[in-house]
Amino acid sequence: MLKSNIEFKNGTPYICIDGVLHAPLAYTTYFEERGEYADFINSGYKMFFVNVSFTDLPINNTTGFTPFVSGVFETEVPDYAAFDATVRQILALCPDAFIFPRINVAMPRKWVAEHPYETVATPTGNRESMCSDLFRLDGAMLLQTLVEHIRSSDYAHRIAGYQLCGGTTQEWMHHDLFGSFSDMGLEKFRLYVQQKYGNEHPAVPTRADFKDGTNNETVSRYGAFCCETAATTVCHFAKKLKEYICNEQIVGVFYGYHAFVNDYLWGLHGMRFLIDSPYIDFFSSPCAYDCNRNFGVDWGDMFATASVKLHGKLCFIECDIRTHLTRRMQDARPGRYTDDFYGLYDAHGNKTVWCGPETAELSLSALRKAFAHQLVNGSGIWWFDMWGGWYHDDVLLADLAKMKTLARAAEEKNSSQYPSAETVVFVDEAAYLNNPRGSDFTHCVNRTRLAMGNTGIPFDIFMTEDADKVLHKYKAAIFTAPLPSESGKNAMVLCEKYNIPALLPDSAKAFFGTQELRDFLTENGVHCYNADGNVIYCGRGFVGIHAVRDGDVVISLPAKYKVKPLFGAAFADCETENIKLFMQKHHTAVFELL
């Protein structure tokens, strides 16, 4: 049985398997019959997430979509055939592959039907409630059964870790996207308030309270309850899984969108309750879907990745990057999906987030910009080829192979010797509860993160709870909550104490645009690499740029370095403090500093 853990080297987390460090780059697909396993194996990849679910009920309770043709526990006798076949297919091609089961903890139909009180209504039928103790109990038993099968199988010796998913879209969101609002949910909320605040007869909210701009104590407390409940559920299953695998391998969870999702009723603002869990080794979320993943902006992180690393965890980011080969889901699996959801174009003919670039050239740029962002931040990547066939192109695969090699080579670079972010952006997770649900103030985090991406100034994202540990490293701080929590207020006080210039939103000025952010930062001594609106990536001895228009660009380094082009540029290695090149609109270039 393989042993795995997260180990840091030169400030960057790696997956250590049987004492050997591995750069966290992996591949997965929802449609295994169209999986490009051979392509990625031939490109040097050895890590593979393999999806498996307790049920084939929808993962999206609005559209009714599920990628799962079968659920392990939907039959009288557990059916592991599809999962086993995929694992064996990969190992036949690459006997030394590392397999990571990606387990969807979702209760089968029979359980849902037999326990209506433990469920919550959704547009496509009832599903298990995050509040349900019975769900946690019975779900853990099913998880144990599945894991026992995996650990007793003929491929057990290649299992290197696990990822736990659940809730809506497998991202541990409440199935109803409304805080598991039900009779049982409200009863659990009453107990929560009684135990936490000593209130013998707590008021409970109505649905209308969350839709009319109300923000009273009861509403705010229910929002906190939603997030703590989701976090408790995630931690419960992670703890159980660690027990079942005798703490021998890493466990990750798909959770934590506090820098992207602004609705606390989804349950995703509970990272502060999980970040120190001894049962969770890595966190995953997609790179952000800002502007429908259009070019010209940074596809940033949905959670405070710098905080996750500070607490000894790996950020293993889903990069579901569409390409010129991305097809309609219905065409990729003919006859399976009759409704036209996840279409490539909307009713007005505009591209949706499901549509890829028109050309292989722009597809290369998309992969490069996603890779550059994660490379400089020391995060892992799993390329999510959702419907299969997205990367089946020799040009794309050549780049993906080079990325794998670079990620491995970067292990030896001492990141402290190279330029890094001088700006900290703070996410105040608890501050969402201070605002009416859906109000403009709740969008400030996402808008600020997006605007920062075009300042030409690198930045790190931390939770306000970590301010005392990290502020001394930065020249300036950006806050994102007009109505801060106590943690946010404490972080602001620390800025004053350490004489760190801080940009503070308030009710009169809740949001700052790109130019305002750039001006504030440069006026306070922060180095700007490019002031023309291009996206800049910098860290760990690498620099990248994503161009917003055609023309000559200059990347101004803070000192002179030997520069080696890696992607998107062709010139001899040279020593310079100004990288100059001509770039086409929406192309991406990446360089190594030596």
Residue map of PLM features:
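Hydrophobic faces of well-ordered beta-strands that scaffold small-molecule active sites
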Residues: A23-Y27, F48-V50, I99-I103, A160-L164, ...
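N-terminal carbohydrate-binding accessory modules
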Residues: M1-I41
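The substrate-binding groove and active-site-proximal loops of carbohydrate-active enzymes
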Residues: L21-Y30, N51-A81, A121-M141, H149, ...
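Acidic (Asp/Glu)-rich catalytic clusters
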Residues: Y37-G44, T86-D96, D154, R272-P278, ...
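Polysaccharide-binding and catalytic clefts of secreted carbohydrate-active enzymes
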Residues: N104-A106, V112-D290, D298-W299, A304
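Short, acidic/polar
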Residues: T29-N42, T145-H149, N262-D276, S363-F371, ...
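Aromatic-lined substrate-binding rim segments of carbohydrate-active enzymes
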Residues: R34-T122, T233-I245
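Carbohydrate-binding surfaces of carbohydrate-active enzymes
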Residues: C235, E243, N247, D281-F283, ...
